């Protein structure tokens, strides 16, 4: 009773065709295949990276002489003063006394 019968699969397939349309299904399947292929190659590459031993310190090239110091640009700037805040003008006018 818990397993999917062929009728269940047919209904699921019909719903998928109705939702995505028969024209988009081949493109979706192609994209899914490409994604799986890329995923498999990345997993395989990660496994190969883990299986190769890390290079030892003895095989590292000898250190080169210290690089010459580069001139440092002057990063100081003049202080910037912020503009004065603008006071909002009143929209209504008070009646003038006579």
UniProtKB/Swiss-Prot annotation:
Pfam families: TatA_B_E. GO terms for cellular component: TAT protein transport complex. The keyword Methyltransferase does not apply. It is a single-pass membrane protein. The chain crosses the membrane at residues 1-21. Belongs to the TatA/E family. HAMAP family: TatA_E. This is Sec-independent protein translocase protein TatA. It comes from Rhodococcus erythropolis (Arthrobacter picolinophilus).
């Amino acid at each position: 009773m818990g397993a999917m019968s062929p009728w269940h699969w047919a209904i699921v397939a019909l719903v998928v065709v109705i939702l995505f349309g028969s024209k988009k299904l081949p493109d979706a399947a192609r994209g899914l295949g490409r994604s799986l292929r890329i995923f498999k190659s990345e997993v395989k590459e990660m496994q190969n990276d883990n299986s190769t031993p890390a290079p030892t310190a003895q095989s590292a090239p000898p250190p080169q002489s210290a690089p010459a110091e580069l001139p440092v640009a002057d990063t100081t700037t003049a202080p910037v003063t912020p503009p004065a805040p603008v006071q909002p003008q009143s929209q209504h006018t008070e009646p003038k006394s006579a």
